[in-house]
Swiss-Prot record:
Residues 65-88 are annotated as: Disordered. GO terms for cellular component: endoplasmic reticulum membrane. PANTHER family: PROTEIN FREY 1, SIMILAR TO RIKEN CDNA 1700029I15. It comes from Ailuropoda melanoleuca (Giant panda). Keywords: Endoplasmic reticulum, Membrane, Transmembrane, Transmembrane helix. The keyword Ribosomal protein does not apply. Its main location: endoplasmic reticulum. This is Protein Frey. GO terms for molecular function: protein-macromolecule adaptor activity. GO terms for biological process: fusion of sperm to egg plasma membrane involved in single fertilization; gene expression; maintenance of protein localization in endoplasmic reticulum; protein N-linked glycosylation; protein stabilization; protein ubiquitination; protein-containing complex assembly; sperm-egg recognition. It is found in: Endoplasmic reticulum membrane. The keyword Methyltransferase does not apply.
Length: 99
């Protein structure tokens, strides 16, 4: 078996491969446009300290939670610890059964 270059047997294939290489090289070696660097102006920079101290419950970043935890026992905690084999409470499904 005689090994030859692909372009020797199929001249059009060699030419199309060469053109493909040229197009890929032109696309990959083209300089990329630089993105404009956005900087924050001096007048928009935030103060390092708050003017008024926050009162109440805040986290490490000084953000107050929207819904703080309620005080006292949770009523659904005992119901959540039921066993699976106990089955559902049918009184919850038929709320008008006591009427």
């Amino acid at each position: 078996m005689v090994r030859t270059m692909p372009g020797a047997l199929y001249p059009r294939a060699g030419l199309s491969l060469f053109l493909l290489y040229l197009v890929l090289a032109a696309v990959l070696l083209r300089p990329q446009p630089l993105r404009p660097q956005r900087s924050v102006p001096e007048e928009f920079s935030a103060p390092l300290e708050l003017s008024q101290p926050l009162s109440g419950l805040v986290d490490d970043y000084g953000v107050r939670p929207k819904h703080p935890w309620p005080r006292g026992p949770r009523p659904l905690l005992s119901r959540a610890q039921q066993r699976k084999r106990d089955g559902p409470d049918m009184a919850e499904y038929y709320y008008n059964a006591h009427l």
